[in-house]
Amino acid sequence: MASPTSNLSRKELAIKDLLTEIAKALVDHPEGVQVRAVEGSHVTVLELKTHPEDLGKVIGREGRIAKAIRTLLGAAGMKLHKRFTLEILDED
């Protein structure tokens, strides 16, 4: 079962903070960036939410920015022996 962000290790919190800083650097409305981590036994899902106007900036043309961020998360996860998944949430 998934657990809340408070159970993340210090290194996992650093990765969450890294994602937050990367997203804030990409968007026009950095105050709208929110990252929520949902931890499972073998995977931590990082849910990224941005201002609706900035959604395309974190996805990028043909998903290139999102793919690059996922690559960074994958490399960090290998070092921690943990899998990180990025979900980019849009306003419903």
Where are these predicted regions, by residue range?
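An amphipathic, aromatic/His-enriched active-site/gating alpha helix that lines ligand/cofactor pockets
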Residues: 65
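RNA-contacting regions in translation and RNA-metabolism proteins
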Residues: 1-55, 68-92
